[in-house]
């Protein structure tokens, strides 16, 4: 049987980090087993579902590179199918119409609580065989088995058993003509041939009800794997402030999608002591049965370390589009400066995020207007104009402007003046960047471009002369 998994977000907000991990695990399980991954949008909550949230989810999935074989499939396009299955259950004696008012339902729950019983529907209409009629309170309820136990072997948590006496006859079709969540997902999983349901353990209480529904409609019951939640660094539930952010905020913060996926994979799954995984390694090694049954803690410092590794090792061409995004976010004209590939090569060893890389690269994409006073005082002393002037002379004469050629010219400058390289590099670094901290001097000068480099050296020579 072909493995088929699904990621089924409700479009009531952005895709947060926990949802991204769920999507990743579903995607990896399907890819590892040579199966198929389905994206389903569970949008039957018409009051809370928005097109903006749908767009945000699709954008995040695309950025993460989690491609799907089918979808997006929208539940709101399938309401007629849900009604067809619900009415068949009624015809088969497995479900029934009920018409209690809100006040009557509240009275049932209050009576149960007065007896110190679990508040729930008491099955008043279960055996009445009421016909369908126009009524603002009309619902369809599923006849949950009265005896027995629901037993399933969770792929992550192990065997779980729930007595049917703990469950009531749940509503499967609401008065507004829409299915309930538990019913719609079961019909969807049946129609879409889903074989494995991987989701957060906040859904675990739904599983016994859903298993009874699968069996009630004659559908095969998929395997279930419920992942524990992700906690913040203090062990508390994640909040927006502590990391439960929109996935696209991680993009804005300068994380590479492959780095985020590698980190998320380890938040609940492991393969020995290995900490870093390429996308292909994850596909080859992932098995949902290896997931941890205990909650994981988000560690932003660890994520930074992982991202730094990917910046150092990933193909330059793969990093460039993400750097361009960061440069444009800063309002920079990418065409007005060095090739982004060259910026990646120069800075990839010196930063943790692409945002930091872009901020350090600003000096090469716009005019230099500010100088660090301490750097000027230290390196624009009398005599510095000699090194600057000789460097300008040799740089201007270069037949070809490359980082290597620039490096040779600067070493020739030091040799011609019989001084250490630092005496040439530091004044030149301040001249080009306005600070005394930058990548190696050959890349620093090269990235400015010949015309800008010569102009900035001229300004620096004037500053030294007038100091």
Swiss-Prot record:
Instruction: Give one Pfam hit by family name.
Output: Anticodon_2
List the keywords (alphabetical): Aminoacyl-tRNA synthetase, ATP-binding, Cytoplasm, Ligase, Nucleotide-binding, Protein biosynthesis
Listed name of the protein: Glutamate--tRNA ligase
Query: What GO CC annotations are associated with the protein?
Result: cytosol
Sequence motif 'KMSKS' region, residues? 237-241
Location in the cell reads: Cytoplasm
Which gene produces this protein? gltX
Supply the EC number(s): 6.1.1.17
Provenance organism: Stenotrophomonas maltophilia (strain R551-3)
Q: Does the keyword Ribosomal protein apply?
A: no
The entry's function note states: Catalyzes the attachment of glutamate to tRNA(Glu) in a two-step reaction: glutamate is first activated by ATP to form Glu-AMP and then transferred to the acceptor end of tRNA(Glu).
